């Protein structure tokens, strides 16, 4: 887009990805969406991932173990995003150490550009890594 970063502002967001929110169910009570960590930590966006989680639940509402497994598969990259964001927050980020996860995050975002509503460029993600 040709713009430049003037300043960055941040607000606290809950960083708990689905892999850190188990169990997703207890008896007949089932967690869905943001209650089980379906927030994309890099953007703080949770509405669309939560609606996707509802679809996963509806497909598996008669088998909670299958639901848990499907959620784990669908949101697998979220753990990598969590690790990336946490390392940046704690000033413990090493690009070389994070490279495999960084590439996975880029591929995921590139594949889902329509969902994110933006063109994903490696150069822009690199700016985030360097910030």
Task: Show where each model-derived region lies.
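FAD/FMN-dependent oxidoreductases across multiple families
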Residues: 1-62, 66
């Amino acid at each position: 887009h040709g713009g430049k970063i003037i300043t960055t502002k941040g607000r606290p967001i809950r960083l708990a990805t689905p892999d850190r929110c188990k169990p997703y169910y207890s008896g007949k009570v089932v967690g869905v969406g943001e209650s089980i960590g379906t927030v994309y930590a890099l953007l703080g966006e949770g509405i669309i991932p939560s609606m996707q989680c509802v679809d996963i639940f509806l497909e598996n509402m008669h088998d909670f173990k299958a639901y848990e497994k499907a959620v784990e598969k669908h949101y697998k990259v979220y753990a990598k995003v969590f690790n990336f964001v946490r390392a940046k927050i704690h000033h413990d980020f090493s690009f070389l150490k994070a490279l495999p996860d960084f590439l996975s995050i880029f591929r995921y975002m590139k594949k889902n550009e329509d969902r994110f509503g933006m063109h994903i460029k490696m150069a822009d993600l690199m700016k985030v890594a360097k910030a």
